[in-house]
Amino acid sequence: MQVKSIPYGINFKYKIWGVCFMVNKKLVAAGVVMSIFAGSLVGCGGSSEEGNGGNSTQIYFLNFKPEIADVYKSVAKDYEKETGVKVKVETAASGDYEQTLKSEMAKSEAPTIFQINGPVGYNNWKNYCLDLKDTDLYSHLSDKSLAVTDGDGVYGIPYAVEGYGIIYNQEIMDKYIALSNKKTDITSVDDINNFDVLKEVVEDMQANKDKLGIDGVFASTSMASGNRWRWDTHLANLPFYYEFKDESQDDASIIETGLASDTVEFEYNDNYKNIFDLYLDNSCTEKGLLGNKSVDDSMSEFALGKCAMVQNGNWAWSQIKDVNGNVVKQDDIKFLPIYTGVDGEENQGICIGTENYFAVNSKASEEEQQASIDFINWLFTSDTGKAYVVGDLGFIAPFDTFNEDERPSDPLSGQVMEWMEKDNIKNVNWIFQSFPSEKFKETFNDALLEYVQGTQDWSYVVKTVKDAWKSEKAQ
């Protein structure tokens, strides 16, 4: 099983979808032939009917991303208009996808399309993952090695490349750079290329927050239950990326090193602490209140201009633009790498990869499986579907069905693509798919919360993380 960074496909192909009709042949009386005939025409759109009841097979998609839940519902409506096939879209609460999936899979009408987060996710759900190697969508995947595979089978197809880092508001940064009394000598955000410079700038901005019109440099470090994934997953990716990189022969084997590691040293824990403390100490919210703060709170603070920076990914654009009273201009939203003080980080980029893999339920009926495959294929090959992908969904899709003009229009996805194309920059691979379990992340989070609240010191966090990795790997 292998996961790599995903290139953006530029070749263009368009698949024309045919329309087929089925006629109910059970006629009750000659006098009602025409009315029954008219009422029994059903556009199949690649799916089939269940028995003779005239009800089209329904697709059930369990969505992972709350921030685009409404978009997927619009997608479902348009798909039904074009094909006559209904798509039920349900969305798990933030941080609760795995538990929600377990609950939904136990029901008689289980999801027909769900998401796995890479090799570990596949290992948990391998008995429910259909082999997709013969599907059209897999044939359009730009690099076949990007899929989650097991033997000759393909069980997870990546559908989006994403990136995260420190999102900043260029307008506020320009105000800081123009300050006559600033203690740093930066003349551009480009001068911030390591942790030492970042720390110096952030602390000086915090000291000048009133002049800058902000409550703090960073948005709230959200520590409410279900809202800590930015710290146990995304921020934690960096220290473990560097630890596994030190033990790997090349970049391609970093995630395999993590998957094979029964123990970790958490060697770069001080680097994690560097940036985490910087977030906490220069926030628009006091530490004692962070236990009740959500990701939505953080994004609202940024959108309303209460802070200059927030750690998040390109998916956050929808959260920013939809905030009532948003004051951040689209052209002012940019990415900085998450610098932590690692040697040579001047050439480090943002974190780019994917944890987004579509899987189709192997326990569903053949009709439901085919209908689900057809829907996913439509999303990435039809004009309507692709318009959603590069528009409201904002995906950087890894398929050859998109040409150079079909790129996401939102600023953060555009930033990800710019970082992918920078010379002499090494973006950080996503390797958190190698983390042993959701319980490991929860344990990590609980220790972080105690650290934030001042009831435990940092050494407790380090020990907890190392012990949790070992115990979860032993399961």
Task: List each model region and its residues.
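Hinge/lid segment of periplasmic solute-binding proteins
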Residues: 117-174, 332-338
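A local structural motif
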Residues: 57-58, 82-91, 109, 181-190, ...
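Conserved N-terminal structural module of periplasmic/extracytoplasmic solute-binding proteins
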Residues: 6-10, 16-18, 23-31, 38-121, ...
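Extracytoplasmic/periplasmic solute-binding protein
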Residues: 153-159, 196-260
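C-terminal capping/gating helix-and-loop segments adjacent to ligand/active sites or protein-protein/ligand interfaces
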Residues: 352, 394-402, 414-470
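Glycine-centered hinge/linker elements that transmit conformational signals in sensory
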Residues: 200-203, 246-292
